[in-house]
């Protein structure tokens, strides 16, 4: 009935039968999602350390193509501020990567997301956090590539800093996740 062309790959149909001219994933045109992986967790994650601190939420995949880009999507997190407890103004978030089981390193030299409340709240507040980040880590085919969000205090203080806060009963079982998409480049 019709043909969809994506670069050198064609997808055609006649009735309910589809034909794909791609011989393998290596034929995927630039910008195509090659694979995805998701890790889901629940429960509060917190520390009294300034950071950056590992969140423990790790998503790992083995790239199918050389030179791919990776889109990380962190969602469902409750960012937290508590102005009644040692001036906990909020949290900054980073994305770290480990290649072939090596040490985790910041993908960028900076923060990828932050949550900050300046001023006296008189109470605590949770704010929904979703963040995406596109990166191109260096790897060799066959290596695993593991992504993990890290977090740190938004300001100097001595209170607890939260990656994910479950301060009210409805949030106690709330899930959050990290999805990673491998994208052909």
Language-model-derived ranges and their functions:
Residues 1-45, 185:
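Glycine-rich, low-complexity segments
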Residues 53-55:
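Secreted extracellular polysaccharide-interacting domains
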């Amino acid at each position: 009935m019709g043909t969809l062309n994506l670069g050198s790959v064609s997808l055609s149909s006649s009735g309910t039968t589809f034909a794909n001219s791609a011989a393998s994933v290596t034929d995927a045109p630039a910008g195509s999602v090659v694979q995805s992986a998701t890790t889901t967790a629940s429960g509060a994650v917190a520390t009294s350390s300034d950071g950056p601190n590992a969140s423990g939420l790790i998503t790992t995949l083995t790239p199918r193509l050389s030179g791919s880009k990776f889109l990380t999507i962190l969602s469902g997190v409750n960012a937290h501020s508590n102005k009644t407890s040692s001036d906990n103004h909020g949290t900054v978030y980073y994305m770290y990567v480990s290649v072939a089981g090596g040490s985790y390193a910041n993908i960028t030299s900076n923060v990828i997301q932050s949550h900050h409340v300046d001023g006296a709240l008189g109470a605590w507040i949770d704010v929904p956090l979703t963040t995406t980040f596109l990166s191109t880590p260096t790897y060799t085919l066959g290596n695993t590539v593991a992504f993990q969000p890290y977090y740190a205090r938004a300001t100097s203080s001595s209170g607890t800093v939260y990656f994910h806060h479950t301060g009210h009963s409805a949030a106690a079982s709330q899930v959050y996740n990290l999805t990673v998409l491998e994208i052909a480049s």
